Amino acid sequence: MQYPFQEVESFWQKFWEEHKSFQTNIRSSKPKFYCLDMFPYPSGAGLHVGHPEGYTATDILSRFKRMKGFEVLHPMGWDAFGLPAERYAMQTGIHPAITTKDNIDNFRRQIQMIGLSYDWSRELSTTDPDYYKFTQWIFIQLYQSWFNPELKKAESINELIRRFSNQGSNGLDYRQFNSEEWKNFSPVEKEKILSDFRLVYQAEIPVNWCEALGTVLANEEVEEWVGKGYEVVRKPMRQYMMRITAYADRLLEDLELVEWPPSTLEMQKNWIGKSEGLEITFPFLKPLQSGLEGIRIFTTRPDTIFGVTYMVVAPEHPIVSEITTPEQKQKVEEYQKTSSLKSDLDRMELNKEKTGVFTGTFVFNPADPSQKIPVWISDYVLYGYGTGAIMAVPAHDQRDFEFARTFGLKIIPVIEGEISEAAFDSKTSTCINSSSSEISINGLDYTSASSKIISWAESKKIGRKKIQFKLRDWLFARQRYWGEPIPLVHYPSGVTKPIPESELPLVLPNLEEFKPSGTGESPLALAKDWLQYKDPSTGEIGTRETNTMPQWAGSCWYYLRYIDPKNGRFLCDPELEKKWMPVNLYVGGSEHAVLHLLYSRFWHKFLFDIGAVSTKEPFDKLIHQGLILGEDKRKMSKSLGNVVNPDDVIKEYGADSLRLFEMFMGPLEMVKPWSTRGVEGVFRFLNRIWRLFHSGSQESFRLDDVEPTPEELKILHKTIQKVNEDIPNFSFNTAIAQLMIFVNEFTPSDRRPKKVLESFILLLAPFAPHIAEELWKRSGKMESLSYEKFPEADPQYLVESEILIVVQVNGKLRDEFKAPKDVSQSDAISMAKNLDKIKGILEGKTIRKEIYVPGKLVNLVIG
């Protein structure tokens, strides 16, 4: 007799949908549990069996929490804007609006086949104008805000304007002007100053340009697309940026508030990259015509300043043309052109050959003015990091060492150590060769020497102690069609303004030609009627911004919209936000450890500053599921032909088999290979469960109204205890193993005690909900078990009356026996000697020593 899974699963999926079984009562007085999956990008390929792993894990926990009396919010939606969707549309020749809808429909169908308990009434898509209305609203708030360094929070740009009107730029780390000068600035001059403070601003910067994709990529995106075979080069462009760096300290500090995997916390810390050091200027031998007096650098090793033998400026640094002598101009320009064809990843490759060109210019070392230092350009220095220039200390930095060896530059050791074949970097050795008429740090350790150099530089007003971050501002604009339109308008007067909030959403126009232009201009530039905009307050005619937002924009705040998805006035009702935030559990791939998680934390902190949310962090607990590999133990890929489609697995074995197997494969966070034989094994287990409740035919359901025996209650409550412990800890594999032990214990028996087996059905329900619902119904219950109380273990049945004692002879395991829990030493040794196997070993031997470890083992030492 086989479990009729097709019939059962079809019935219950339809039942849950018709009865809206998993709709959240958002205003419930029950304790809340917000369980969230990272919503998927709906690709044309659909799901493979790796996708349901995380979804099944959150579903088990959501079902468990409902049965524990929680009001559960467990939604699903679609991250559907962005480059992948547009590329798919270009490959198929079908408009992305159509392909995206078709892909979403397919994803939804596949997800619903798995029996996941989502509240589909809250389904959302980032491409829905009712959704991106508020993505655009958040953008406008960012544009109209600045970060007050004194308060360490965002404020309205109007507060900054008031400050300038009252006291000028006094107290800010900015070029100084007074209130009268501010009032006399033109509107364009004022806007340029405000742009230096806005959380959204435009800048002419070297960007990662991909010709094949026709767009720029954020630094964090380059590795992914280069890995896919696309060429990415550096190209100067005027781009919209988000000042995420203003929040660097808070992004770092508030990692203490969350329960995330240590590896993810470390990745975020490293990406933010906080470091303390010295910012100092190395003066030119004579000032430049522009008035520039020197090259500013930042170093975390002020103690090595006497070891500087050359300086390096990034090839794309704006001062390169100024500092290059006529004799070196051709070589420098050729090198700049060559380096622009390389991505940052290529340039930062540690093992690559070092290249560079001398600019013809010299500076002197401020700590030792007698030292004349040549200034080079080299692509191992990036303009986007630090100041875009470095002081090179080849004796104590490996890249500088290799560069110096390549070009025959001096290598001066200033820290005790061996540098014959490689740079020697140490913070424990003392300084040598570090003395001049200005200052001496010889004999000092790293801490003392660095402190002395910083104090000296500050007293001379040539440098200052500074905290630096590796984190760069977020490159926000994309020269693509399929994204949220940026709600800004550029006017001939030189001023840029957002459209009125009452005009949101700014809807993406329906263009038939959506391919990139190849010129760096967005396809939206072709929407002539859409481009022109008349300012409702001034009547001035302007041009809309044609770049679109990156894919990450919509995913920065979607967790808030699930709480209140139909609200047309605000992104989320404040009362509901206070009740439901933060997200209790967030599950998704570790590939999002930096990008999505960092961007969403940034937006959330901004929303916290303006009072739109009540929590400092969006996601309390984070779990990363491990990859499921193909049966060949390689990552699933169409090109490798090892993709397993969940549709096929469900068709042959059922959704409960897929769910159980993926949770039984091993710990959730581990990488695991797919196994068809493993699915077959789990399918056999479900059939054994079915037969446990049926005697002979599909209609012969059996539960007996008999009192359970103490042994039956022991195995039940041991199982209850184990499952209750394992589900919150995501130890689903061991919980399922315990359910299997239960079935093994009961299968040989002819007894089917109702009280015991009904509890087992409830224990099974989070893992295999279809079969559990069917068995519950067949037991005579009129309601779905989704909200039944989850079983609790009775402590009296968890106490073991017997213990297992192992028997060793000369330290080798020979046998074991059960004994009363309070067995005495003499009785335990006697019982061990009377075991048949032990009697045989002891025959003719002398027992020299008897050892008893209470409750664990007997060891007999014989001669």
UniProtKB/Swiss-Prot annotation:
Main location: cytoplasm
Species lineage: Bacteria, Pseudomonadati, Spirochaetota, Spirochaetia, Leptospirales
'KMSKS' region, short sequence motif: residues: 635-639
Listed HAMAP family: Leu_tRNA_synth_B
Xref: InterPro entries: aa-tRNA-synth_I_CS (IPR001412), aa-tRNA-synth_Ia (IPR002300), Leu-tRNA-ligase (IPR002302), Leu_tRNA-synth_edit (IPR025709), M/V/L/I-tRNA-synth_anticd-bd (IPR013155), Rossmann-like_a/b/a_fold (IPR014729), tRNAsynth_Ia_anticodon-bd (IPR009080), Val/Leu/Ile-tRNA-synth_edit (IPR009008)
Organism in which the protein naturally occurs: Leptospira interrogans serogroup Icterohaemorrhagiae serovar copenhageni (strain Fiocruz L1-130)
Keywords of the record: Aminoacyl-tRNA synthetase, ATP-binding, Cytoplasm, Ligase, Nucleotide-binding, Protein biosynthesis
This enzyme's EC code(s): 6.1.1.4
Name of this protein: Leucine--tRNA ligase
